[in-house]
């Protein structure tokens, strides 16, 4: 940051992740050093269902995220229904432990190292004013910013020998001739679909949404009367909104997200000097 301050990153994980136990230990001062990441800030994206299991002193199931990708795409009752369905699915890889044992490990690590940070997925999404255009997947390093984000993904375009074209999401299943189901991103020019030979496979990257913080503070040591606050706050809000339009953006997708959401935050500082 301007060559004077190191950057920092917070990594969020949901408590059903198979690697959650190792993740919690990332900043521990003891143990095997190669399994530590002291410059990262681990954080948990906790669901209501997990806390319910803790209160009930019941069991909690851990999954491989590759097998349950949609758990990260939902919250609330939808998450609960899918999670329980995966628990009952005998074909899914899983580990089971007491929810309270995992919670005790979280709290022990928190008191020892100050991490992981704790944020609550369902609470954040229930209060999301932009729930109609997406959902919140994590917070930031300071755990006060909650914005919609989306990962990058790819569209797969198959052009066949007869000149026809079909487009798929990369995870879509396609039954190729021979009866084998392949993900769209695994189909090649050696395959045929519905009797049509694939000629060209093209991959198009679709940018996701990256949250941007547009922040400022009012210095209460200088601005502290009712008249001053009523005068300065509207100006500060307009200034922050102007910054969105005038700012330099290192990535195209960052600019697109900021222009779309126009999220701003105005805080205060200098209370001790009032």
Kindly give the residue locations of the regions a language model identified.
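Extracellular interaction modules
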Residues: 188-197
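Amphipathic, non-membrane alpha-helical segments in soluble helical-bundle scaffolds
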Residues: 205, 226-233, 257-264
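Active-site cavity-forming subdomains of large catalytic enzyme subunits
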Residues: 1-166, 172, 197-207, 211-217, ...
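Acidic, low-complexity, intrinsically disordered interaction modules
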Residues: 171, 175-179, 183
